[in-house]
């Protein structure tokens, strides 16, 4: 199966805006900005761009407006305002217009993929192979390389007990706007690819969309996927039963016939997914390009001798 997940432009009604301020007495900066993640904004600005102690910069996001992920990115204007407020010793305000936001704010998606599924004679999944080309745009954004890796490739097992999963992602720089997190950031791309492939498998095997999924749902937990993630629990059959009941699938054929009598077509489609929320641990996320520390876990052991070890 060959699929294109086309490039999208967030295009929020409220363009990005920022005010940079500098307090000469305390040598501290304040940036008011419509950013979805002010903590990451401050971290990246101080550590990687301005070379300032983090406590010397305060980033405040009072009203963000629409963002959809595009306002997570650390934009050049935010840094320039902060720097210029000290240089000129005054507050500086900047607001993007709709045209420049449409062209230069971070875009989303832009994957071209080829996927293959091996099955046995009963429609049980044996192996999945995916090769994706991810367009990152002209240069890296905050989460550009994390989206098609830790947020996409690790979700391609879905909720199915496929024993073998192989994922290869090639990322490219092109003469386009940078791509960053957008509405699910990698996870919708994974679901779209996997569910389109599962639908195709049902057609090839002559099975219903309901049945192909039921035959392959994970039933034993905890379940270690072949692509890093471990699922602690889940009841996908119950979810499918509930969805069928809510949609009155049992009465679908009657509704389909009634539509046909009026010269109309009626169909029914299935899509199921599992989503990983959050990105961690930080060392893995960082290695895959998140460019920001996220959350970690720790352990303290008190030994019989009274000594303490912190992991």
Set out the residue ranges of the language-model regions.
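Extended, polar/acidic
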Residues: 1-44, 145-161, 179, 235-285, ...
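Short coil/turn connectors at secondary-structure junctions
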Residues: 15, 25-29, 52-56, 88-92, ...
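Glycine-rich and small/hydrophobic secondary-structure elements
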Residues: 12, 69-121, 179-204, 225-250
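Short acidic (Asp/Glu) and glycine-rich catalytic loops that position anionic groups and cofactors
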Residues: 59-62, 173-178, 214-224, 303-308
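Acidic, glycine-rich active-site loops and adjacent beta-strand->loop/helix elements
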Residues: 35-38, 62-67, 96-106, 132-137, ...
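Glycine-rich loop/linker segments at domain edges
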Residues: 1-18, 110-197, 279-280, 284-296
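Beta-strand segments within the central parallel beta-sheet cores of soluble alpha/beta enzyme folds
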Residues: 55-62, 89-99, 126-131, 162, ...
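Alpha-helical support elements that line or immediately flank enzyme active sites
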Residues: 18-88, 145-155, 183-211, 242, ...
